[in-house]
Amino acid sequence: MRKRREGSAAPSTQEVTRVRTPRKENHEVLATVGSLLGSKRVNLQCMDGVVRMGRIPGSKNKKMWIREGDVVIVTPWEIQDTKADVIWKYTRPQIEWLERKGYLK
């Protein structure tokens, strides 16, 4: 038997109840995905003005599908500031909330 598809709701109808923001004590930064480099790596334009190469950890690889233009939270490496780990991906309603509150420019 085939699986029955359920109709998806329009993104604008979703209500945002809680949005995860970057935590300064963990050195987290907002970033926009510039390009996909392959092999679980992405090019990131961070909000602190640095272009970093991001790595998608194996625990989030299958659960978090990332495309160009997505807004994510990254943690820069302590050893190399030009590299970072992607730890969170925002949905469209969450991105709109971040823009309204002034987190994104």
Swiss-Prot record:
SUPFAM superfamilies: Nucleic acid-binding proteins. Residues 1-22 are annotated as: Disordered. One of its GO terms (biological process) is translational initiation. GO terms for cellular component: cytoplasm. Keywords: Initiation factor, Protein biosynthesis. Gene3D superfamilies: Nucleic acid-binding proteins. Residues 17-91 form the S1-like domain. The keyword Protein biosynthesis applies. GO terms for molecular function: RNA binding; translation initiation factor activity. It comes from the Archaea. Belongs to the eIF-1A family. Seems to be required for maximal rate of protein biosynthesis. Enhances ribosome dissociation into subunits and stabilizes the binding of the initiator Met-tRNA(I) to 40 S ribosomal subunits. This is Translation initiation factor 1A 2. It comes from Methanosarcina acetivorans (strain ATCC 35395 / DSM 2834 / JCM 12185 / C2A). The gene is eIF1A2.
